[in-house]
Amino acid sequence: MALDTDRPRLYYSDMNDAIAVALVHAAHRVEARVETALAGVGLSNAKFEALSVLVSQDRPISLSELAEKLTCVRSNVTQLVDRLEADGLVKRIDDPADRRAVRAEVTALGRKRHAAGAPVVHAVLQDVAKKLSAIDSQVLKRALDAVQ
């Protein structure tokens, strides 16, 4: 994919900026594809990611811990857990160590919905990956690792 150098200079001042902008745009396009695919199983990407964390932990976790693992702020996680709870995918339980805190626990329906979403996400990601040659993939992986 060629860089879109027809964009106004407002977006970038040199090739490095153009590459960074192209990377962000590519990420948005992949995320949109994942979002569309997950809609078919009744999930958003945010819900799927939260369920992924909860399923992988296999124990109730605090909302602060969930926020940390999702790399977002606690208030966003509170709203996300509200939506997950309304859908019956997560339940809040009291934290035995801190009466002021609650933990999020994935429900059986949440596990089932996550299990339905995982192959959908995998298929989208595989489709994206197969568009890259093995050499392109190695170069891109090194470049993305450097950004972190």
Describe the function of each predicted region.
Residues 1-41:
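N-terminal leader segment of winged-helix/HTH proteins
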Residues 5-6, 31, 62, 82-142:
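Charged, amphipathic alpha-helical coiled-coil/dimerization segments
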Residues 18, 49, 138:
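Active-site phosphate/pyrophosphate-handling residues
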Residues 20, 69, 103:
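Short aromatic/hydrophobic contact patches that present stacked aromatics
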Residues 24, 28, 32-73:
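N-terminal helix-turn-helix DNA-binding core of bacterial DNA-binding proteins
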Residues 144-148:
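A short beta-strand-loop micro-motif that forms or neighbors metal/cofactor-
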